[in-house]
Amino acid sequence: MARLQKFYKEEVIKKLQSELGLKNVMEVPRLEKITINMGVGEAVNDKKIMDNAVRDLALISGQKPVVTKSKKSIAGFKIRDGWAIGCKVTLRRQQMYEFLDRLINVSLPRTRDFRGLNPKSFDGRGNYTFGVKEHIIFPEIDFEKTDAIRGMDITFTTSAKDNAQAKALLEAFGFPFRG
């Protein structure tokens, strides 16, 4: 069992149940999945860029990413229907908690000029998304071997009913929110 998963079951559930005034343990919000999305628009011209992005995302997440393809042709972006334009990976269970642990304790503190995560990035339904400008903040990525510095979006999907419950859950895990 991952360290944060054990921490959630032993401490976070009890704390949130009393803090949020919930009667049933099953009402306590939980983290359902983490989705990491990397848009690679430059891959339209060079397929090697997509291969490198997939390799980097696999190293970061510990799981093979799915290549996302464009749904329709857009002349302004010079893309055609079905072309590879990004990659994503969905983490659940053990791998999700291990990634979360590395993200909070190792990667986010390595970010340049990091002042905390924006507390307004909740979607209204208990999910939280933030962007990472440089994927080299993850210790799995060797700066010397990367061809380019890429950004990515990380989405935390929770079972929380609203933003307040989701924020309480993420703060209990130790998310460094601003303010």
Swiss-Prot record:
**Which biological process terms from the Gene Ontology are attached to this UniProt entry?**
translation
Q: Which GO terms describe its cellular component?
A: ribonucleoprotein complex; ribosome
Q: Name one GO molecular function term.
A: rRNA binding
Which keywords label this protein?
Ribonucleoprotein, Ribosomal protein, RNA-binding, rRNA-binding, tRNA-binding
**Pfam families to which the protein is assigned, alphabetical:** Ribosomal_L5 (PF00281), Ribosomal_L5_C (PF00673)
Matching entries from InterPro entries are given as: Ribosomal_uL5 (IPR002132), Ribosomal_uL5_bac-type (IPR020930), Ribosomal_uL5_C (IPR031309), Ribosomal_uL5_CS (IPR020929), Ribosomal_uL5_dom_sf (IPR022803), Ribosomal_uL5_N (IPR031310)
Function field: This is one of the proteins that bind and probably mediate the attachment of the 5S RNA into the large ribosomal subunit, where it forms part of the central protuberance. In the 70S ribosome it contacts protein S13 of the 30S subunit (bridge B1b), connecting the 2 subunits; this bridge is implicated in subunit movement. Contacts the P site tRNA; the 5S rRNA and some of its associated proteins might help stabilize positioning of ribosome-bound tRNAs.
Q: Which PANTHER family match?
A: 60S RIBOSOMAL PROTEIN L11-RELATED
Subunit structure, as described in the record:
Part of the 50S ribosomal subunit; part of the 5S rRNA/L5/L18/L25 subcomplex. Contacts the 5S rRNA and the P site tRNA. Forms a bridge to the 30S subunit in the 70S ribosome.
- Family per similarity comment: Belongs to the universal ribosomal protein uL5 family.
Q: Which NCBIfam families match?
A: PRK00010.1
What HAMAP family does its record include?
A: Ribosomal_uL5_B
Name used for this protein in its record: Large ribosomal subunit protein uL5
Q: What organism is this sequence from?
A: Dichelobacter nodosus (strain VCS1703A)
Question: What taxonomic classification does the UniProt entry list for its organism?
Answer: Bacteria, Pseudomonadati, Pseudomonadota, Gammaproteobacteria, Cardiobacteriales
